[in-house]
A protein has these predicted regions:
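A conserved ligand/cofactor-binding region detector
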Residues: 1-202
Length: 202
């Protein structure tokens, strides 16, 4: 089979997957195409392909009894995932062609993704760089952090006073999050708290 025929098959398969997710994952009507639904349909379709490779990688680690690195950080700032995953899978042209067939542009859909609010500082960027480096060097590594509801906040000045507003990045849930309610671990924080009043009554 030629490259053009293979490309056409990949585009057709992706189009069908996007519409399937719009209908069966989101419970929405694929017609007429709507950017919000098709953005999520594309995310879930990319995730399907990503998970297949992820599971293959996991099996190879277990089969070779590889040592693994576990990186614990209170913050991660990976940036938007969709285009990063599309490029890592080598399917950017396939995605562009599939999305254009629905009368949309890939760049428009990519812009609909919220930045994950998993932190708000240089520590988070550094942690994400470590994870990228481990992946590039084929080092089995896992990042562990906190799934914040409000990991980032916005600041504004109103009448001369600073005001903060939360960034609810999970308001529409995230297509990249696997919620595993059957796995629960107790995390203990040791120490004690003491309550007292000083001489000023504070």
């Amino acid at each position: 089979m030629g490259d053009d025929a293979q490309f056409a098959l990949q585009v057709q398969a992706l189009k069908e997957d996007i519409q399937r997710h719009v209908a069966h994952t989101l419970g929405g009507d694929p017609y007429p195409p709507r950017k919000g639904r098709y953005f999520l349909g594309l995310c879930y379709s990319v995730r399907d392909r990503l998970v297949t490779k992820w599971l293959e990688t996991q099996r190879s680690f277990y089969d070779t009894i590889s040592k693994r690195v576990y990186y614990l950080s209170l913050e991660f700032l990976p940036g938007r995932f969709l285009m990063n995953y599309i490029q890592a899978l080598g399917i950017e042209d396939v995605c562009r062609e599939a999305v254009q067939s629905f009368g949309m542009e890939l760049d428009e859909l990519v812009e609909k993704e919220w930045n994950p609010g998993l932190g708000n500082g240089g520590l988070g960027r550094l942690a994400s760089c470590y994870m990228d480096s481990m992946a590039t060097c084929c080092i089995p590594g896992y990042g562990y952090g906190i799934l914040y509801d409000y990991g980032i906040f916005y600041q504004s000045i109103v009448n001369g006073y600073q005001q903060e507003s939360a960034d609810n990045w999970l308001r529409q849930d995230s297509p990249w999050v696997f919620r595993r309610g059957n796995f629960m671990y107790k995390i203990h924080f040791y120490g004690r708290s003491e309550v007292y009043h000083d001489s000023s009554g504070a």
